[in-house]
Amino acid sequence: MELIEQVAVAKKANIYFEGKVASRSVFFSDGSKQTLGVVLPGEYEFSTSQGEIMHVTSGSFEVLLPNSSTWQAFSEGSQFELAANVSFKIRNNAIAEYCCRYL
């Protein structure tokens, strides 16, 4: 298991889509922030306010990236990058987890 050490973690979760997506904010001493999330099976659309890198930490997602008409598969250990101010969709058939690093 990979660990994130010497951080502060928000006690309150960020809850989306009627509880089907939940994440916790993790704050680093250098001022940066990441979120660790769990996604129940379904299809969801998100928007970014800043650039981010999404790391799939367990399970898998299909992702419809901005300006694309083709869903792409991302499994555990893979990642994809998103620009600021874009929308994208994810879907999954089983519980999956991610770590989002903000750029």
Curated annotation (Swiss-Prot):
EC number, as in UniProt: 2.4.2.1, 2.4.2.2
Coiled coil: none
Superkingdom to which the source organism belongs: Bacteria
Class in the EC hierarchy, top level: transferase
Keywords in alphabetical order: Glycosyltransferase, Transferase
Pfam assignment, any one: Ppnp
GO cellular component: cytosol
One of the record's GO molecular function terms: thymidine phosphorylase activity
CDD domains xrefs: cupin_PpnP-like
Reaction equations catalysed: a purine D-ribonucleoside + phosphate = a purine nucleobase + alpha-D-ribose 1-phosphate; adenosine + phosphate = alpha-D-ribose 1-phosphate + adenine; cytidine + phosphate = cytosine + alpha-D-ribose 1-phosphate; guanosine + phosphate = alpha-D-ribose 1-phosphate + guanine
Classification via HAMAP family: Nucleos_phosphorylase_PpnP
Function per UniProt: Catalyzes the phosphorolysis of diverse nucleosides, yielding D-ribose 1-phosphate and the respective free bases. Can use uridine, adenosine, guanosine, cytidine, thymidine, inosine and xanthosine as substrates. Also catalyzes the reverse reactions.
Family to which the UniProt record says this protein belongs: Belongs to the nucleoside phosphorylase PpnP family.
Protein name: Pyrimidine/purine nucleoside phosphorylase
Biological source species: Shewanella oneidensis (strain ATCC 700550 / JCM 31522 / CIP 106686 / LMG 19005 / NCIMB 14063 / MR-1)
